[in-house]
Amino acid sequence: RESGVRQLERQLGAVARKVARRVAMGDTATIDDKVISSDEVRELLGRPKVHPERLAEHDEVGISTGMYYTPMGGDIMFVEASIRRGSSAPLKHDDGADVVRVGPISLILTGQLGDVMKESARAALTYATNNAALLGIPADRVASASEAHIHVPAGAIPKDGPSAGIAIALALVSEMSNRKVRRDVSMTGEITLRGRVLPIGGVKEKVLGAHRAGIKEVIIPKANEADLEDVPDEVREQLIFHPVETMREVLAIALVDQGRAAPIEVDELIGV
C-alpha cells in the first residue's frame, strides 16, 4: 500500500536482520524450511499498520460499495444514505456539514467530500427523485422526504472525484425504495442527470482493491471495458464484470430483489 516499494524494501531488510540475529544466537528454527510464515512476520514486525476495508457482513438498505484509488493503490469504500421525512431542513447545520437544496430536499454531505464528489451527489439525488416512478420508489416517499444525508466513512480522509456517482445513486434509490443492496458487488462510474454511466480512471487499481476486499462482482462503465486488459489474469478469472451504460442496469444488478443480470465473461469483454 505505497507508491513504489521503498517501504517494502525497508521491511524486508528488517525481517532479514532479525532472522540473522536469531541465527547468530543459535536459534535456527525460523529458517529450517527457508520460509517465514505470516505468523512469524507478525512476530518480527509487529501488528499490521494498514487495515483495508473488507466486504460487508450483510446486504443492507441504503449502503452501497464504491471503489477508489490513490497513489497508494485501490480499495473499496462504503457510501451510506439516509432519508429524513417531515418539515424542510435548514440550509446550514450547526455542525458545519455541507448542505444544499435539491428541489424540496436538503442534501447533507459528510465525510470530507471534495467539490466534484459533491456535484456527483447532487446529480445522483436529482436523478433518483426525477425518475422515482421508473425506479420503483413510492411517490409518498419522495413527497415526504425533507432531507437526504450522504456519508462516506473514514471522515478524516479527504475524498474527491466523479467515479462514486453510481454508488451514491444506488445508495439513495435503495434507501428511498427500502430495497437492500448486494454486499458482494462493488462499482465505479460517473452518473449524469439522465442516468447515463460515464467512464472513469484507475480501473486496474480499483479492481485489484475490490478483489483484495473479497468482492465477487464489479460494475464498470461500458466505455472502460478495454481497461480490463490491464488487470492480471489471475484476478480477472476470479471476478464477474458487468459493463453498463445506464443507472437502471446498475440497479438491476445490485439491488437484491431486482434479480441478477447475466454476468459478462471477461473473454467476451476484451476478446482474449
Where are each of the predicted segments found?
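Alpha-helix C-capping/helix-to-loop hinge sites
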Residues: 2-3, 22, 26, 238
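Short, surface-exposed helix-loop/turn micro-motifs enriched in polar/charged residues
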Residues: 4-7, 30-33, 139-142, 183
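Extended amphipathic alpha-helical scaffolds
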Residues: 16, 20-80
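Peripheral, non-AAA+ core regions of ATP-driven protein-machinery
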Residues: 51-55, 59-60, 64, 73-272
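The conserved phosphate-sensing helix
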Residues: 1-17, 73
